[in-house]
Regions:
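N-terminal cap/lid segment of alpha/beta-hydrolase-fold proteins
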Residues: 23-56
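Serine-hydrolase catalytic-loop signature spanning alpha/beta hydrolases and amidase-signature enzymes
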Residues: 68-71, 93, 137
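Short amphipathic alpha-helix adjacent to the substrate-entry channel of hydrolases
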Residues: 73-96, 103-105, 240
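Primarily recognizes the serine-hydrolase "nucleophile elbow" in alpha/beta-hydrolase
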Residues: 136-208
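Alpha/beta-hydrolase active-site loop
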Residues: 113-144
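Short beta-strand element of the alpha/beta-hydrolase
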Residues: 56-68
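C-terminal catalytic histidine-bearing segment of alpha/beta-hydrolase fold enzymes
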Residues: 247-318
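The feature captures the conserved acid-bearing segment of alpha/beta-hydrolase catalytic domains
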Residues: 178-249
Length: 318
């Protein structure tokens, strides 16, 4: 097949809404983990019913939805079968809210490069803070939920993937965000569906990151595959750039040539067993591997991949 190489804040309410999905034998509970001004932030926890009474601590997948920091839902129907698949595989799945700071901003305020970069940075910072609060909530309830706080895997789609990767990047660089989390905490892994990190200048890693699984299409016009930089300062640095930086680290990199932003959701259906392999081998098994998979479609020979920062702004202002 083509080319292949071996590359959470205390609860603000005791509210808990429980839904049992009998057909799938999945228990779903909803919790409020933070109230921030007008925003009530919730998370949904999915777990196999027959595992609730077990004694073994389980690993956790903490998921952040996509939506361009303008919208999106933690309970998007398109995600549910992926959550159930992971729950049946023995994981506790937590899908979290975060504030979407771009939803109420007048587009004219960030139609230029500087305005867009400033608004985007603020939105990412806000989302990452909420993701950290959701992480803390999980850790604080680890005994009650019978989960292993050392096995929390961050996962996200598009804007949610940026959020998950950015959280890991902040931890590795010991920023103020890391101080919001328990001392010496790190995620056990990150799974990114079309994500990137935001940095002023070329990203630097003070500490090595946890194992990363990066899905991205090289024709993505929404989130840069390699980079989108404003005057060589603030920029989004995509999966390809991250992977080139971390090529000697534990990374599973999945490229789809000629494919756009559909890799922000398609792996949740099409690559489930690749994801389980990454979790079992590189995260839980702690294997030292760099895994690269390049998917080629012979019917796609010519496509646009050289997008400018202006292209990304236009796409994200739709």
């Amino acid at each position: 097949m083509g080319k292949r190489f071996i590359f959470i804040l205390m609860a603000c309410s005791l509210l808990s809404i429980t839904t049992v999905v009998h057909a799938q034998h999945i228990d779903k509970q909803t919790y409020i983990f933070a109230i921030k001004k007008v925003d009530t932030l919730k998370l949904d926890k999915y777990v196999m019913i027959d595992q609730i009474q077990g004694t073994q601590s389980k690993p956790v997948i903490l998921f952040a939805f996509g939506g361009g920091f303008k919208g999106g839902r933690r309970d998007n129907p398109d995600y549910i079968s992926y959550f159930h698949f992971l729950a049946r595989a023995g994981y506790v799945v937590v899908s979290t809210d975060y504030r979407t700071q771009l939803k109420d901003i007048d587009k004219s305020e960030y139609s230029d490069l500087q305005g867009f970069s400033s608004a985007l940075q603020q939105a990412i910072t806000c989302a990452v803070e909420d993701f950290g609060d959701a992480t803390n909530y999980i850790i604080e309830h680890s005994v009650e939920w019978q989960i292993n706080p050392a096995q929390i895997i961050a996962c996200g789609s598009s804007a949610g993937a940026i959020t998950a990767l950015q959280a890991e990047y902040e931890i590795c660089n010991q920023t103020a965000f890391a101080d919001r989390l328990p001392a010496n905490f790190n995620y056990a892994g990150v799974i990114s569906f079309s994500g990137a990190i935001c940095a002023n200048g070329i990203p630097k890693w003070i500490m090595s990151p946890c194992p990363l699984m990066l899905f991205h299409g090289d024709a993505d016009s929404t989130v840069p595959f390699t980079k989108a930089v404003v005057e060589e300062e603030m920029g989004l640095w995509g999966s390809n750039f991250i992977c080139m930086q971390l090529k000697e680290k534990e990374t599973a990199y999945y490229i789809a040539e000629g494919i756009g932003h559909s890799l922000s959701y398609s792996p949740m259906k099409d690559n489930r067993h690749d994801i389980l392999s990454f979790l079992n081998r590189l995260v839980l098994g702690k294997e030292k591997r760099c895994i690269t998979t390049v998917e080629k479609n012979p019917e796609i020979s010519r496509y646009k991949s050289d997008f400018t920062i202006e292209d990304y702004i236009r796409e994200n202002m739709r």
